Amino acid sequence: MASQATTLRGYNIRKRDNVFEPKSSENLNSLNQSEEEGHIGRWPPLGYEAVSAEQKSAVQLRESQAGASISNNMNFKANDKSFSTSTAGRMSPDTNSLHHILPKNQVKNNGQTMDANCNNNVSNDANVPVCKNCLTSTTPLWRRDEHGAMLCNACGLFLKLHGKPRPISLKTDVIKSRNRKSNTNHAHNLDNFRNQTLIAELKGDCNIESSGRKANRVTSEDKKKKSSQLLMGTSSTAKISKKPKTESKERSDSHLSATKLEVLMSGDCSRPNLKPKLPKQDTAIYQEKLLTFPSYTDVKEYSNSAHQSAFIKERSQFNAASFPLNASHSVTSKTGADSPQLPHLSMLLGSLSSTSISNNGSEIVSNCNNGIASTAATLAPTSSRTTDSNPSEVPNQIRSTMSSPDIISAKRNDPAPLSFHMASINDMLETRDRAISNVKTETTPPHFIPFLQSSKAPCISKANSQSISNSVSSSDVSGRKFENHPAKDLGDQLSTKLHKEEEIIKLKTRINELELVTDLYRRHINELDGKCRALEERLQRTVKQEGNKGG
């Protein structure tokens, strides 16, 4: 601090104006005296300045003689009359002593106010500045207009921005301050938010780990309980052990229903991972569902045990000439857990192979390796999506049911037009030839009754994988000759029906096309008639005008 005083000893320090003026020899002597009297090392704090009475009087004399315009914090000029040499005489002898550390803005002397630069003396009672426009005396900053009139901060800013005086209606006694948020507070809030998010994430990770540990503990406890239940073999423990299985089944059923909904909405029938499921129920109830709802595509799931296999008797006559049998048809369907995608209707006639007839006198069962398709689910009229399934993928024994012949006859008697897709019909015709050739090569003709459901809607139903076995009594088997079985007649009848349906479809499409063409011709003829009439009217008008001119 002493070094600062010695280096700045030859300058009058003005912190406000950043002006360093050289001192006289008297001022240097007075400064040396003050240092000798115990003020060595003292320095005015920040915002203050050291001012002596002699310096103030000398500066005032110089400024009054030069007539310079002096401005203070209030930004206004002071006249030379206000600055006089009498101010030095008015000061009390107390101020002529050592350097006093005074505030930066004012020096109070006997009821008067003097600013730090000694630029102006203003009385608190008489010379209070007043705004010329709004007549206010409270403002944080005084301004002046282009003529030198004193204005408050608000009026001065309004005049500077708008170029006209501020209206008095905008005058307010309350000075409003700007609400500015500091950057430090904003950064602090951001840091707090980040810390909170990190803490929440850490807590979530801890909760996940704890839940995983709990799940592992629960699974281990469940395993122990299951083992104890198996050892004890009580009914109560058996009930408890069935709960997780039912929950897993419900979850898998919900997942399968969602995937089926997606398949039906998108029209995509080539999902190999889609496994149809149904809850366990009686065969009669399921048969009634199939009879009432022919588009029911789900296949009933059964176990492979022989005790659960049952025969369902139903009357089914595809045609009086093609089905002379009076025996009841029983359906045995056994679906494995890994049943692949369901084949299309075109696989109905081309997959008849590898049949076996049991001669034990009680029943005759024919198993189809490739599966026989029955139509159930509807497809879009404009799309002919066929699902080609490999014969090896289809299980040997597939359980399904036959639809009611009453529904078939009702749908055939319906006057609504039949609109099949041409590509699928061609596929069926090709597979029909294959089926006939396969039947001819076999020594004993099988008792297959492939079922073709012709619907009135513009669709071809998707096939459920199935194998149909005909249970015939021993008396009927003994009195019947297999050589007289109408398997060949069945193929011929199917081919004739397919040809007829195809011709009907072609004729109806041709009729629709001709109707559209006739409608177009009619419109064109009407347009030509209108043009002819307009031309005739114009001709008549021109003839009349020429006749009037000639007459």
UniProtKB/Swiss-Prot annotation:
Superkingdom as given in the UniProt entry: Eukaryota
UniProt xrefs under InterPro entries: Transcription_factor_GATA, Znf_GATA, Znf_NHR/GATA
Region (Disordered) residue spans: 17-43, 212-260, 379-400, 467-490
Keywords: DNA-binding, Metal-binding, Nucleus, Transcription, Transcription regulation, Zinc, Zinc-finger
Biased composition (Low complexity): 467-477
Compositionally biased region (Polar residues): 228-239, 388-400
One GO CC term, this protein: nucleus
Stretches annotated zinc finger (GATA-type): 131-155
Gene3D superfamilies, sorted: Erythroid Transcription Factor GATA-1, subunit A
Alphabetical GO biological process terms: maintenance of protein location in nucleus; negative regulation of transcription by RNA polymerase II; nitrogen catabolite repression of transcription; positive regulation of transcription by RNA polymerase II
One Pfam family of this chain: GATA
Subcellular localization(s) per the UniProt record: Nucleus
GO molecular function, one term: zinc ion binding
Extent of Basic and acidic residues compositional bias: 244-254, 478-490
Miscellaneous comment text of the record: Present with 319 molecules/cell in log phase SD medium.
Cross-referenced PANTHER family: BOX A-BINDING FACTOR-RELATED, TRANSCRIPTION FACTOR GATA FAMILY MEMBER
Name of the protein: Protein GZF3
